[in-house]
Amino acid sequence: MFPMVTGFMNYGQQTVRAARYIGQGFMITLSHANRLPVTIQYPYEKLITSERFRGRIHFEFDKCIACEVCVRVCPIDLPVVDWKLETGVRKKRLLNYSIDFGVCIFCGNCVEYCPTNCLSMTEEYELSTYDRHELNYNQIALGRLPMSVIDDYTIRTILNSAQIK
């Protein structure tokens, strides 16, 4: 008779332990139910990037003095700077400036060390194309400012990134 009682006691203990495990899992599920979703509907919703975001590089042709500091500090010698020395003025004149974003690692050294601040990082991160040759931007393409995510009325922006966590 005693083995039967101990069997019922073991069964009762196992039932209580199983109920406790199920309850713990249920509490975790309930704690996750109150959180906001992590993902966003990308083409229609966009996150506003931080101020220090390293996006596409913006270039101002008029400020550049063709010193080639950006080429020297770039770890992959990426910016191509074509210039001509004007002998009468003894000054460099910039002819062409281009960056291939298919190779760029967006380290930001060129922007940081530019003495005239003619380079800056934008919030544009949509650089994907079907042809990699389209990623080679010249001074005209680099000079275009991207449309701000905040100004685009077709896109709903997620202002506070803390809500997404």
Swiss-Prot record:
- Residues forming the 4Fe-4S ferredoxin-type domain are 55-84, 95-124
Annotated membrane-spanning segments are none
Which Pfam families does the record cross-reference, listed alphabetically?
Answer: Fer4_10
The organism sits in which domain of life?
Eukaryota
Could you say which residues bind [4Fe-4S] cluster 1 here?
Answer: 64, 67, 70, 114
The signal peptide stretch is none
SUPFAM superfamilies, per the entry: 4Fe-4S ferredoxins
Q: Does the keyword Ligase apply?
A: no
Report the catalytic activity: a plastoquinone + NADH + (n+1) H(+)(in) = a plastoquinol + NAD(+) + n H(+)(out); a plastoquinone + NADPH + (n+1) H(+)(in) = a plastoquinol + NADP(+) + n H(+)(out)
Q: Name one GO molecular function term.
A: quinone binding
Ordered alphabetically, the record's keywords are: 4Fe-4S, Chloroplast, Iron, Iron-sulfur, Membrane, Metal-binding, NAD, NADP, Plastid, Plastoquinone, Quinone, Repeat, Thylakoid, Translocase
EC numbers for this chain = 7.1.1.-
Q: Which biological process annotations from GO are given for this protein?
A: photosynthesis, light reaction
Question: Which PROSITE patterns does this entry report, sorted A to Z?
Answer: 4FE4S_FER_1 (PS00198), 4FE4S_FER_2 (PS51379)
Report the Gene3D superfamilies cross-referenced here: 3.30.70.3270
Membrane topology, as annotated, equals: Peripheral membrane protein
Q: Which cofactor does it need?
A: [4Fe-4S] cluster
Record localization: Plastid, Chloroplast thylakoid membrane
Biological role: NDH shuttles electrons from NAD(P)H:plastoquinone, via FMN and iron-sulfur (Fe-S) centers, to quinones in the photosynthetic chain and possibly in a chloroplast respiratory chain. The immediate electron acceptor for the enzyme in this species is believed to be plastoquinone. Couples the redox reaction to proton translocation, and thus conserves the redox energy in a proton gradient.
Similarity comment text for this entry: Belongs to the complex I 23 kDa subunit family.
Q: How does it assemble?
A: NDH is composed of at least 16 different subunits, 5 of which are encoded in the nucleus.
Q: What is this protein called?
A: NAD(P)H-quinone oxidoreductase subunit I, chloroplastic
Q: Please tell me the species this chain comes from.
A: Oenothera elata subsp. hookeri
Which gene is annotated as encoding this protein in its UniProt record? Answer: ndhI
